[in-house]
Amino acid sequence: MAGRSGDSDEELIKTVRIIKHLYQSNPPPKPEGTRQARRNRRRRWRERQRRIHSISAWLLSTCLGRSAEPVPLQLPPLERLTLDCSEDCGTSGTQGVGSPQILVESPAVLESGTKE
């Protein structure tokens, strides 16, 4: 893991294994029995899943000192984002990767469809 010490990696791996074990200890309910019995099993399973999720979040924040939720990425406004195909992008799916372009000006083609 880039930018972290080896001890932190070991703690992360240990914590992930614990969380994985928690989720594996709660398999989905069997689809048998009456409708009411299936509904009750699903309801109890969802409650256990919610508890496991909150325990996992607690483990990540307490043991590793980080949030369970990813840090939100600040993006520019959608009006400023456009696709620039003026360069030869290729069709293989691998060319042009790693050099995204953000243009400030929106092309007139896109603007004509947004006016009401």
UniProtKB/Swiss-Prot annotation:
InterPro entries attached to this UniProt entry: REV_protein (IPR000625)
GO cellular component: host cell cytoplasm; host cell nucleolus
Protein keywords: AIDS, Host cytoplasm, Host nucleus, Host-virus interaction, Methylation, mRNA transport, Phosphoprotein, RNA-binding, Transport
Miscellaneous note of the record: HIV-1 lineages are divided in three main groups, M (for Major), O (for Outlier), and N (for New, or Non-M, Non-O). The vast majority of strains found worldwide belong to the group M. Group O seems to be endemic to and largely confined to Cameroon and neighboring countries in West Central Africa, where these viruses represent a small minority of HIV-1 strains. The group N is represented by a limited number of isolates from Cameroonian persons. The group M is further subdivided in 9 clades or subtypes (A to D, F to H, J and K).
Domain comment as written in the entry: The RNA-binding motif binds to the RRE, a 240 bp stem-and-loop structure present in incompletely spliced viral pre-mRNAs. This region also contains the NLS which mediates nuclear localization via KPNB1 binding and, when the N-terminal sequence is present, nucleolar targeting. These overlapping functions prevent Rev bound to RRE from undesirable return to the nucleus. When Rev binds the RRE, the NLS becomes masked while the NES remains accessible. The leucine-rich NES mediates binding to human XPO1.
Function: Escorts unspliced or incompletely spliced viral pre-mRNAs (late transcripts) out of the nucleus of infected cells. These pre-mRNAs carry a recognition sequence called Rev responsive element (RRE) located in the env gene, that is not present in fully spliced viral mRNAs (early transcripts). This function is essential since most viral proteins are translated from unspliced or partially spliced pre-mRNAs which cannot exit the nucleus by the pathway used by fully processed cellular mRNAs. Rev itself is translated from a fully spliced mRNA that readily exits the nucleus.
Residues spanning the signal sequence: none
Pfam families xref list: REV
Taxon lineage: Viruses, Riboviria, Pararnavirae, Artverviricota, Revtraviricetes
UniProt-annotated location(s): Host nucleus, Host nucleolus; Host cytoplasm
Modified residues (Phosphoserine): 5, 8, 92, 99
HAMAP family: REV_HIV1
Motif mapping: Nuclear export signal and binding to XPO1: 73-84
Post-translational modification comment from the UniProt entry: Asymmetrically arginine dimethylated at one site by host PRMT6. Methylation impairs the RNA-binding activity and export of viral RNA from the nucleus to the cytoplasm.
GO biological process: mRNA transport; viral process
Similarity remark: Belongs to the HIV-1 REV protein family.
Motif Nuclear localization signal and RNA-binding (RRE): positions: 34-50
Gene: rev
Compositional bias ranges of the Basic residues kind: 36-48
Ranges for region Disordered: 20-48, 91-116
Organism superkingdom: Viruses
Protein name as catalogued: Protein Rev
Organism: Human immunodeficiency virus type 1 group M subtype B (isolate CDC-451)
